[in-house]
A protein has these predicted regions:
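Conserved positions within compact, well-structured domain cores
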Residues: 2-189
């Protein structure tokens, strides 16, 4: 999944003062799609699946970090990404981080959303109460050894583990008609 809301630019603020990035991690423009990272991983890769997921041992029930239930792996009680597993913090510095579920809920609740096309790729223009905005491109997601859904849907990770199954984490998912927070399998990029 693309990582967007990384608090890079001091231009976009929602109601409680969270500052959002104006571009995806790994790019210097709002239009390219950015890089794809599995949840909690800090490197891009060529294949995305349980067999290549670094926070587990090859299956959804052998997680080695961020696990709340023993049926999914080694329980550690960690619910949100630590700074050593937050690609935004590692890349941009300690004041930067992947948004939490709460941050994304605020984006959904306090901002206006409008479908927009940039360089042939649709996405959503998200405008805050101060009139400033970010563009979330429909960048698709990586699974197996390919990226699918470019121009069809977008998925943007939060830093928050999904309560109903430690093999998932929350992400903002959207298509041309809906946008919502959902739990999704952690190995997707």
């Amino acid at each position: 999944l693309s990582l967007h809301a990384l608090f890079r630019s001091r231009q976009f603020r929602t109601s409680i003062g969270v500052l959002w990035a104006t571009e995806n991690l790994g790019i210097s423009s709002v239009y390219p799609l950015g890089k794809y990272f599995a949840w909690g991983e800090t490197e891009c890769k060529t294949s995305y699946g349980w067999d290549s997921y670094t926070l587990g041992k090859g299956t959804y029930n052998t997680l080695t970090k961020y696990c709340l239930d023993s049926k999914y792996g080694i329980v550690d009680g960690l619910f949100g990404l630590a700074s050593e597993d937050d690609i935004a913090t590692l890349t941009l510095g300690k004041e930067w981080h992947i948004p939490s579920k709460k941050n994304m809920e605020e984006l959904l609740s306090y901002c206006s959303w409008k479908v927009e096309v940039q360089e042939g790729i649709y996405g959503w223009r998200v405008t805050g109460p101060n009139g400033k905005s970010i563009y979330l491109a429909a960048a698709g997601s990586a699974s197996g050894n390919r990226v699918a859904g470019i121009g069809e849907f977008g998925r943007y990770w939060t830093s928050t583990l999904y309560e109903e199954g430690s093999y998932s984490a929350y992400n903002l998912r959207f298509n041309q008609s809906t946008y919502k927070l959902v739990g999704d399998t952690r190995f997707y990029g």
